[in-house]
Amino acid sequence: MASRKNQNIAIPLCLPNNCRWNAATGKYIKTGRQRTSLYVVEEALKKLKTVKGPVCVVSIAGPYRKGKSYILSEAFDQPEVFPLGHHFDPETVGIWMWIVPQKMRDSTGRECTVVLLDSEGIDAVMGEGLDDNQIFTLTVLLASVLIYNSAGVPTRHDLNGLDFIMKLSQRIRLCSNDGSVSASSPREDTEFFHKTFPFFIWLLRDVTQSIPTDCRDIKEYFLTRVFKDQGKERAD
């Protein structure tokens, strides 16, 4: 059982179907059922409906137990809105939401509401691949800005997570406003893709090693080492 009684902390946007949320008590419990899907929490939808004007959704994803909740809270000066765990098992299940009370301005000066989404960490020992895929898919599709949080030097496993995002983008059919399949040109589809999918940030944490001497900066390292087979377009 986990308690969320404080009004100044996040609530679940969606939970696994083996968890039940009680808005009156601010708690969720695990029912003992097998986890097979996610469901939307009605209280979170009600809170979202109160938001007026432009919205920027900032989501964070990555391996479990690597400090995602802490980073997301601190980056937007919203301390302790996402609960922090101190055990092997993950603290966050499903996707949790916090609406930043203060309005912010984007790069164009437009005022907007920032919604923070903290997602369940991938690769938990008690989790399954289907769970990770469901969480990762929703995190990508809901985000305006997606932060991928990893610790240490990038690994092949990190790339597998990014490869999932690329495959997801290839599977989604771009549709016109009326719901019919778009007959637009490849260039128009690419432009629409960049408007639809989130701005991506790979957050490298706790990296004490220096980049190779033949690389001018971290971007060149990614292009020549990490994404050498995918090319510059994929790295961007």
Predicted regions and their residues:
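Conserved GTPase G-domain substructure that encodes guanine base recognition and part of the catalytic core
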Residues: 1-236
